[in-house]
C-alpha cells in the first residue's frame, strides 16, 4: 500500500517504513507528525478531491538537518563588481510509521 502526501508545497509517494527528506517541519526529533493524503492505493485506489476523507499518514521525525550549500554568484563584466551568496535549506528527515485509511 502506498499514499501520496503533500507537505512544503511538494508531493511525495510514500509507503510504510520509508525515510524521506521534506521541507522543515516545526517538530523535534522523536515527535510524531501527520500528513494529509491526496491519493491512496492499496486493494482499491482512492483519489482525493483535493484530499481523501478520513485518511492520514503518520510519521516520526528522525532528525532536523540542512541541505547542501547552493552558491549564487553575480558578476558585472569590466566593473570589478561581484556578489557571492550562499544558501542552505533547512530540512527534516521523517520515517513513515503508519498509513491509516478511512
UniProtKB/Swiss-Prot annotation:
Keyword terms of this UniProt record: Ribonucleoprotein, Ribosomal protein, RNA-binding, rRNA-binding
InterPro entries noted in UniProt: bL21-like, bL21-like_sf, Ribosomal_bL21
* Pfam families assigned to the protein according to its UniProt record, in alphabetical order: Ribosomal_L21p
**GO molecular function annotations of the record:** rRNA binding; structural constituent of ribosome
User: GO CC terms for this protein?
Assistant: cytoplasm; ribonucleoprotein complex; ribosome
Q: What does this protein do?
A: This protein binds to 23S rRNA in the presence of protein L20.
**Protein family according to the UniProt entry:** Belongs to the bacterial ribosomal protein bL21 family.
Q: What NCBIfam families has UniProt attached to this entry?
A: L21
- Subunit: Part of the 50S ribosomal subunit. Contacts protein L20.
Q: What protein name applies here?
A: Large ribosomal subunit protein bL21
This protein's species is Azorhizobium caulinodans (strain ATCC 43989 / DSM 5975 / JCM 20966 / LMG 6465 / NBRC 14845 / NCIMB 13405 / ORS 571)
Q: What lineage, starting at the top, does this entry show?
A: Bacteria, Pseudomonadati, Pseudomonadota, Alphaproteobacteria, Hyphomicrobiales
Amino acid at each position: 500500500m502506498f499514499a501520496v502526501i503533500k507537505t512544503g508545497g511538494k508531493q511525495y509517494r510514500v509507503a510504510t517504513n520509508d525515510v524521506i527528506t521534506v521541507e522543515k517541519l516545526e517538530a523535534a526529533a522523536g515527535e510524531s507528525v501527520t500528513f494529509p493524503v491526496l491519493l491512496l492505493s492499496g486493494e482499491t485506489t482512492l483519489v482525493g478531491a483535493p484530499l481523501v476523507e478520513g485518511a492520514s499518514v503518520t510519521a516520526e521525525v528522525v532528525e532536523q538537518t540542512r541541505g547542501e550549500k547552493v552558491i549564487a554568484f553575480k558578476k558585472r563584466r569590466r566593473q570589478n563588481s561581484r556578489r557571492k551568496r550562499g544558501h542552505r535549506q533547512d530540512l527534516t528527515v521523517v520515517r513513515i510509521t503508519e498509513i491509516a485509511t478511512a
